[in-house]
Amino acid sequence: MKQFMDKDFLLSTDMAKTLYHDFAENMPILDYHCHINPQEIYEDRKFDTITQVWLGGDHYKWRQMRSNGVDEKYVTGDSTDREKFQAWAETMPKLIGNPLYHWSHLELRKYFGYQGYLNGDTAEEVWNLCNMRLQEDSMTVRNLIKQSGVTLICTTDDPVDSLEWHKKIAEDDTFDVQVLPAWRPDKAMNVEKPTFGAYMAQLSQVSGVQITDFASLKEALKNRMEFFTSMGCCVSDHALEYVMYAPAADSEVDAILAKGLKGEAVSKEEELKFKTAFMLFVAREYNAMGWIMQIHYGCKRDNNGYMFEKLGADTGFDCINNYAPSAQMADFLNALSTNNEIPKTILYSLNPNDNASIGTIIGCFQEKFPGKIQQGSAWWFNDHKTGMTEQMTSLANLGCLGNFIGMLTDSRSFLSYTRHEYFRRILCSLVGGWVDNGEYPADMKALEEIVKGICYNNSVKYFGFKLDEVK
């Protein structure tokens, strides 16, 4: 029987161990998509308790606490940090097979030096150790980033954001990790939302463009894209129900926008037409500017209306949506390809059943750059051992796994960089298994290039950041 999470955790063969320890283990981290707060990086926040780090905004953990029958006051309510931590610790032993069990222990080992198991009985010991360590200067936000080997971070930012914290970080020569904005214009696209008109007023104000029709909206967006570019941005991200394609005449789009500006209801057909026009416009702009387009789709959000009214969005009440017409995604990309206007694109579906359809669609539009159109890493409800293995296996079956740009945290926590270790161990186990099974030669030079590429180097080349590859 193997020891729990020893140095060869998840490494099932001798080749897997060699690939991980020789090539993957010490590679830097390029975190090209996350939700951490740049203000906390600039201010070099020091957390008071492990609860603030772990449970302050982690809806992954909140879902499992609720699944374990924990009262909401210990999840998002007004109970003390110590009480919330106890509730989480008592939930942990039930999470056999869940990545949260692995991630939590990886974090305890890497950042706090704790080698035991977290449960209700050890909660006091772990609480005291973690809180003591968090007071050390080595445990500030910036030091956590540095000791994790991170070279660059892309946050997630709205077009109306001032990006003041990114500017301050860039001007601070005491911190050499690049922290760049990423453009997330969902609020400018969601014409069906009752908040759309108020958001358009905000966008008009910050852009200096009075938005009255689609042409002026495009002008306002271009104004803000130019500002984001001046701040180092070259990455966008979109959250879509699915990648739709419902083309419409400019006059139709103007009429739909006019309804949204006045707060009038728009039909589902009108919503899809407006969003199609919006996505085609921004995609063409991304291509012209050399930006990368990320699209996350396949999520049905805010399913528990009662809890949404109490807590708002992103609190643990989202699920996988099984409706994603692949034909429309292909038509969307085809519309861009007509005039060679497809930007580098990364497609993430929350539904693992979409792996093969993504794999076949991206193969229809590859050109010019290795892996120009990417299937994104297993995301959210899929970033566990099974999900990561299935995503990479599908990509290998249908495309060039060696060009894959690998893992991202997609997290709000400064301790989540262990997810890269988790991913790299799974990658090396998968590739090592193929080699040991005679499905790929034991060509260590080729394997080194593949593993280092997927862990880091491919993303350096793909995004074009001012970073050096690791040879």
What spans do the regions from the language model cover?
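Metal-cofactor-binding active-site regions of metalloenzymes
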Residues: K2-M289, E341-P343, L347-G359, G363-K471
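Metal/cofactor-centered catalytic core regions of large enzymes
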Residues: E270, G316-C319
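C-terminal amphipathic alpha-helical interaction region
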Residues: M293-I295
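Hard-cation-handling environments
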Residues: C299, N304
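Short glycine/proline- and charge-enriched loop/turn segments
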Residues: F308-G316
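Divalent-cation-assisted or electrostatically stabilized phosphate/pyrophosphate-binding catalytic cores
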Residues: Y323-M329
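Short, basic/hydrophobic alpha-helical segments
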Residues: F332-T338
